């Protein structure tokens, strides 16, 4: 210190020279300076110290004496309010203290800590300075307190100076004065680790051995025994507990007794001492219900635990949460204590659970003590024990991220597929803790990364909630879906935007997270809405750059689209309403027209009935009827120049004039007769278009347009007629003024044998006498006013008859008919012999198309050819008129219901025939497959018979394979007459008999072919039936008529381009 002072004052001013002289003990220089300047004797330096204080610090007694004689102030204080006496007491300099006290130094002066020189004298082991001060002090001044309300006795006990304690107690110092912490000198004396502190304790207790002093508690409730136990001073504990009034089970503010502190600190000897001197015989517990054994177990003090377990009064009781000391030890990883307890207590329950269901293994897994977990598993601890939350020890380890413990538990048989009461899996808890390594371990143990809890949340959402990017990356790299929604519709992006984790948001968008997913609640917030609500500006900017929308923007877009759809709906609805209105108007127009036609038909029917009642009025008065169809060719041969061309004659009838009436006057007809030829020539140019229009109106082959034109240029509507039923007369004559013939397909029913005589009689009665020399006049007869037949009769005939178009695919069902366009239909007579009948039929069908395609495309050609055929038939047959086989009907005069019935009946018949063909094809394929399987089974059976038939089996197998793979199956034609041969007379009885004789199976297996020969529209190739000859005991299989057009497969048929070798049967 002297060197430092010298350095401090070296080269300083005059004042510094005074302090330097005091420190250096240069009495002469000090005196010279003081004589030169008397103010220098109390001059303060930068610390406020005077030369006298430096003399005390430097122990310069002679210089101090010189300064005091020069008049220096003895009570002068420095900046810390200490005087020279404080410094002398602090140093324990008895001589200076005595010098200063003789110069009347103030011993009650307090420094900034409110300490007097008396407090400072207790620091030294020698009691001389303390005794010197006590001589100058009054009796009441000995208990002066400092800033901490501590007296000199407190300091003496703290410094463990038993002599100072005795001296102060002798001078009537109070031993029961508490300081600022409530401690009395006995607390400070017991709170000492030195065994010699027992003397200080004894000095105080000897002065006042009272119970209150011995069990005095400070402001924290601790007694001197608590402090003695805490310091581990066995001698002091022994002295304190030797008094009977000492309370061993005294609680402090933590509800801990001295025994708790001894166990917590591991003082086994003190524990034994306290247990022995515990007269109550019970082990108290603290505020948590823990006994001293719990504290000893968690601190891993095996010796202390052994002392507790060996004492008979100690039991392993549970705390307030049901945990035993064994669980405390497992939670702290106290392996030594666990081994000690397992060895000393054989009845210990290792799987005992607390009130939450947790076991010792739960506690060890939660704390991450691998060695403790292994020790417990070795002692048969239950690895999948669940608590009240259905958490196993593995859940606790995953939550805290203890990888080693997780792997140890999994190796020990812990299940990884369990969930807790909220549906959280192990992966959920690992994600909530942000443990990426644990997530990877769990995924490697076959845990689904997209597993959802009962709220629908995935581990990825849990990781996104905490912003654990590494954990999120591990999950999404293992195929975790970032777009999975929970039950409220939130995704991982919602949670990241809500908490403002920008890095997590970038990671989610990199893994194709949808930025506009909406919630399922009423608000329907998107991730951008969460960012807006949290005012996450960086997140908002980033989300907007990546196409994120708020719910308001989505609603605007949806409203725009809804409006567009609604506008389109209104337009379509208006269009439908307009269309329905137009259709309603059209229906009303059609109903009015139908009603008008019905009224006209009733009127005509009434006129016809009236004409039948007076048949004489129906006959022409001056002119004969027009000749029949058989006479037309002869007339044309006599006047070829006046006959119109065949092409024009075959066209449709002329349009009817609305001005004409059904019954024209006879005079008008006579006036126009001379213009027939010219009219016929003039109307030829208009007939093609008219014929096309009339032909398009015919919906059924059984109904025809037969308009008639009057002689005055007016058109007379034709009278509808249908086929005559049996017993019906064909002699109803119709006289019309037409200019050409129209040939259209019709349903001709040839009169049966029973009808011929009756038809002839009716024809004879109704027609004029026919003469072979009779020449038809160029003038046409007027149309009779009476009609030919009643409407009711015609309706019955149409409903009862069977109509079939010329293009029908059923054999023998289609027939042609020659219809006169301008006159009544000719009366066909039954041929007198079969040759004539065959010629008639052959002539009718010889020019029909050979395929359905030709039938559809050649309607006009069919009409023309049929017309010419009619003329040929008329020449070959008897010119005498025969009974009518059918009459033409005007389709406009038929009811709509009747027309629809006819069309529907014909469609059903065609559909039935197509189904029969289809069934026949299926049966044929099944039959062929059956025969092949039968033959193969036969070959297999031959092989199993033995070696005797091996050669025969090989021959037959080779023959079958060669014939199948080389496609040499012989095709044969049906052994029937050619199609070109004239068919029999197309009578009703014949066609009906043939249709009943034939069946589908017979057509398949080739037993009957007549039904296919007489089809007028089927070609020779189409009517030929292919059949396979018997090959290797394979019976003959007859294909259907469409087998020639079936697909050619490489394994059983030749290619379509390769010629087929046909052999005659």
Swiss-Prot record:
Q: Which disease is it linked to?
A: Nephronophthisis 2: An autosomal recessive disorder resulting in end-stage renal disease. It is characterized by early onset and rapid progression. Phenotypic manifestations include enlarged kidneys, chronic tubulo-interstitial nephritis, anemia, hyperkalemic metabolic acidosis. Some patients also display situs inversus. Pathologically, it differs from later-onset nephronophthisis by the absence of medullary cysts and thickened tubular basement membranes, and by the presence of cortical microcysts.
Question: How is this protein positioned relative to the membrane?
Answer: Peripheral membrane protein
Q: Where is the composition biased (Basic and acidic residues)?
A: 589-616, 687-697, 706-715, 723-736, 752-762, 770-786, 853-863
InterPro entries, per this entry? Ankyrin_rpt, Ankyrin_rpt-contain_sf, IQ_motif_EF-hand-BS
Domain of life, per UniProt, equals Eukaryota
**Which GO MF terms are attached to this record?**
calmodulin binding
Task: Please give the record's comment on domains.
Answer: The D-box 1 (destruction box 1) mediates the interaction with APC2, and may act as a recognition signal for degradation via the ubiquitin-proteasome pathway.
Instruction: State the protein's name.
Output: Inversin
GO BP term, example: negative regulation of canonical Wnt signaling pathway
**Expression (tissue specificity):** Widely expressed. Strongly expressed in the primary cilia of renal tubular cells.
Q: Where is this motif: D-box 2?
A: 909-917
Q: Which SUPFAM superfamilies match?
A: Ankyrin repeat (SSF48403)
Q: Where in the cell is it found?
A: Cytoplasm; Cytoplasm, Cytoskeleton; Cytoplasm, Cytoskeleton, Spindle; Membrane
Residue ranges with Polar residues bias: 627-640, 677-686
Q: Where is this region: Disordered?
A: 589-833, 847-886, 976-999
Q: What does this protein do?
A: Required for normal renal development and establishment of left-right axis. Probably acts as a molecular switch between different Wnt signaling pathways. Inhibits the canonical Wnt pathway by targeting cytoplasmic disheveled (DVL1) for degradation by the ubiquitin-proteasome. This suggests that it is required in renal development to oppose the repression of terminal differentiation of tubular epithelial cells by Wnt signaling. Involved in the organization of apical junctions in kidney cells together with NPHP1, NPHP4 and RPGRIP1L/NPHP8. Does not seem to be strictly required for ciliogenesis.
